[in-house]
């Protein structure tokens, strides 16, 4: 790793040196020498890019960035654009995960994918093979609406913990909500409960060092995912752990869109109301979610938990359908994009999507438009206001082609909508951490739950319909009348859609 960092550092210094000599030459020889060196480094980067065999869209995007923004663009390319880096850095973890999960699931009796509706059978047949993750039937889930429902439920379950509490979050802040959860962690640790806390170093930069030390002193085992100590020369910098997982005694689990911060309970006056969806899990499915945590924990701490029987004893309950946990990211071969595509393609009646970041790749857009052409009701809901300028306008750039195909687009007005929900035909759904953008599809560690639980899906549908009442339905005519300034912003932002 150190050798690779030094190689990138010296190559970057050479690029800057060549750039300076070219622009401020002392002699004609230095001018042409600097220019030649500068062009050679850029061409070498473009050659490496072409060898990655990515889509033509992404290849051309990065070529343009490297040519027109060479110094800054080269940094972005080295640490976010290189797909082969992902393959090399996480190859060992990917193989290890596959083997550990195979051994874990081989102990279980896998339910047959039979007796399901056509769309359900098609999706789960694909997802089992593609994701290599078991399905469960002896499980159930409860849909939790917003932070006001979710965090009291999480805190109550944590206080009842007897053996262990395992927590994994992308964003965890030292504010009123974060300290409330930390107090429970420290209290349970002092009582002898094992408490392990994994946080993403980039997402949780507002987790105070003094709070980390307080938790450690209380007995909480806490580690960061991908620390930022090497700055831009950390090749793993751009691969972030976007998962949100809580496991209590192997009996109860929580997963969904909510991080830990006061904005997630609508207490940030700048953001205002926060709309999100989370799930409470019970039964065998908790073991699968726990396995994802244990593999992530082992990766950053070197403590092996997944082989210990006490952490791998499923607690079955009476189920209400088919359930599957799917983790994606640099450590997994499959992409959430593939699973979303299969869900959309399986639809026969309706597709309802709620996502905060809508920057779909070509395959997702094609599937949505094809479904609408077949007469499937397609609804896409996004927030009116976004916390990212580029993402907001890049999302809007896709609306004209969707509206033209008869797809209904809703702009959520009440506040910021952060949920990641998809409902197919009213009998197949997904809730989790993955957005519909390139970061979730290519770079982030994500986890979603796919299920057929009729009661949970009815709840999601009711919530979606309530959200529609708080949304503006975009009309093709009205949207096409937007001003030149908005069109320009959308076109500019779309240039970066491949890296958002």
Swiss-Prot record:
GO molecular function terms noted in the UniProt entry: cardiolipin synthase activity
Reactions it catalyzes: 2 a 1,2-diacyl-sn-glycero-3-phospho-(1'-sn-glycerol) = a cardiolipin + glycerol
Annotated ranges, domain PLD phosphodiesterase: 237-264, 413-440
EC number: 2.7.8.-
GO BP field: cardiolipin biosynthetic process
Listed InterPro entries: Cardiolipin_synth_Firmi, Cardiolipin_synthase, CLS_N, PLD-like_dom, PLipase_D/transphosphatidylase
Function, in words: Catalyzes the reversible phosphatidyl group transfer from one phosphatidylglycerol molecule to another to form cardiolipin (CL) (diphosphatidylglycerol) and glycerol. May have a role in the heat shock response since the level of the transcript of ywiE increases after a heat shock.
PANTHER family: CARDIOLIPIN SYNTHASE, CARDIOLIPIN SYNTHASE YWIE-RELATED
Name by which UniProt lists this protein: Probable cardiolipin synthase YwiE
